[in-house]
């Protein structure tokens, strides 16, 4: 009898959780695709220090954010089936800054979705973060340092044995996507849960005609590589944010 009661309680608890999710609706905002960071290893003399040169390429279209929203939409529908999420794009560049926080974008979201039916209860905000993401193989050359948002680290491998350790070997290209997914209760403005996504990989430049690591991918492939990286990481991170929300 006790076992039967325990099973009933577990079933009711599961039903209650499913009902709570069914009553929730999400607005999703992606703020990672306004620019791409390109980081280079500078020439090194002496002991390794932070010797990273950073440049930024402004992205006039919003393809990275659009595909991020579509990827988030797929995950939400799979993990917490319910009303269709509301996918929002922001074009005010001030929202994209790492230091901007989520206060202003949450108020902006509230105003946009206040008349939506069914009611939007939560916002999922995807923002850039700074992360100690220098590839391990590069730390002998550049020391520590942070990378931000989405982009590429253009690096060099260790030189062949017996050569000057400050002379680089073959170059490589390391795409990265460093972002945070934050779940916010729109009724209170409080953060419910947040998780960081820290994805990167490395591509050798040994097969390029120029030997330049930047030429390892075409411009279109660079963009698609970042989109794929974000999508794969979202599929890992977003379910953690939604769990128990």
Regions picked out by a protein language model, each given a short descriptive name:
Residues 41-163, 176-180, 184-190, 194-195:
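N-terminal segment of the mature soluble domain
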Residues 14, 53-57, 214, 218:
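Short amphipathic alpha-helical segments at helix-loop
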Residues 6-16:
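Bacterial N-terminal signal peptides
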Residues 15-23:
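Bacterial Sec-dependent signal peptides at the C-terminal "C-region" and cleavage site
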Residues 1-4:
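Positively charged n-region of N-terminal signal peptides that target proteins for export
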Residues 22-38, 139-144, 150, 154-245:
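C-terminal/domain-edge helix-coil "capping" segments
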Residues 14, 26, 124:
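A broad, low-specificity signal marking well-ordered, structured residues that form hydrophobic/aromatic
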């Amino acid at each position: 009898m006790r076992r039967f009661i325990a099973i009933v309680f577990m079933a009711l608890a599961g039903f209650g959780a499913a009902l709570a999710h069914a009553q929730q609706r999400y607005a999703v905002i992606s703020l990672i695709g306004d620019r791409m960071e390109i980081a280079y290893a500078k020439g090194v003399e002496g002991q390794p220090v932070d010797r990273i040169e950073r440049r930024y390429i402004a992205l006039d279209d919003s393809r990275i954010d659009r595909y991020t929203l579509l990827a988030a939409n797929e995950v939400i529908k799979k993990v917490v089936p319910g009303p269709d999420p509301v996918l929002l794009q922001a074009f005010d560049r001030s929202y994209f800054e790492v230091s901007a926080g989520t206060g202003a974008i949450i108020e902006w979201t509230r105003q946009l979705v206040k008349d939506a039916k069914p009611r939007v209860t939560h916002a999922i905000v995807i923002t850039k973060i700074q992360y100690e993401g220098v590839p391990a193989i590069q730390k002998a050359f550049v020391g520590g340092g942070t990378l931000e948002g989405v982009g590429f680290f253009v690096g060099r491998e260790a030189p062949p044995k017996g050569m000057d350790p400050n002379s680089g070997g073959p170059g490589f290209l390391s795409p990265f996507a460093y972002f945070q997914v934050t779940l916010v209760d729109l009724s209170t403005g409080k953060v419910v849960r947040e998780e960081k996504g820290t994805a990167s990989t490395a591509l050798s430049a040994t097969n390029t005609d120029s030997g330049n690591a930047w030429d390892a991918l075409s411009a279109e492939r660079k963009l698609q590589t970042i989109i794929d990286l974000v999508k794969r990481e979202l599929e890992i991170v977003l379910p953690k944010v939604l769990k128990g929300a």
